[in-house]
Design a protein with these regions (language model features):
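N-acyltransferase acceptor-side catalytic subdomain
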Residues: 1-134
Length: 134
């Protein structure tokens, strides 16, 4: 299975995305796609979409991990502004950071998305692909 990087939730057919997102309105293609297409969650505001899609050998969407590359914490509900300078004092870069969250929304819910009865290796493959991005 090879991961594919998506610049927008709208890069996948809605039926494919929704099959994995189920009934969670905040990770729905409609919600994320609208935020991305209107610029509310776009690069100019520090929310660069980098969603990972994983297809099986037959080309069917098997896993999905909504991700955003963040250059700052403006618009986040968790303020980590004290962490960034501390991390930099330790000689490391805190930004950019890759987050699997919903822009401007502190909603709980699954983020490693796989179809019902999916192979247990799919979440691990998504995590490995995300680690490769950073």
């Amino acid at each position: 299975m090879q991961p594919t990087l998506l610049d927008c939730a709208c890069d996948l057919p809605e039926s494919d995305w929704q099959r994995l997102a189920a009934n969670d309105p905040f990770i729905s293609r409609a919600f994320l796609g609208a935020a991305e297409q209107t610029g509310a969650a776009g690069e100019a505001l520090g929310w660069r979409a980098m969603h990972l899609a994983l297809r099986d050998d037959a080309g069917r969407l098997a896993g999905l991990l909504p991700l955003y590359l963040r250059e700052h914490s403006f618009g986040d509900f968790s303020r980590d502004w004290n962490w960034a300078p501390a991390w930099q004092q330790a000689g490391r870069d805190y930004y950019p950071k890759l987050v699997s969250g919903v822009p401007y929304t502190p909603s709980p819910g699954p983020r490693l998305l796989a179809g019902e009865g999916a192979d247990a290796a799919i979440p691990a493959a998504l995590i490995a692909a995300a680690i490769e991005l950073v």
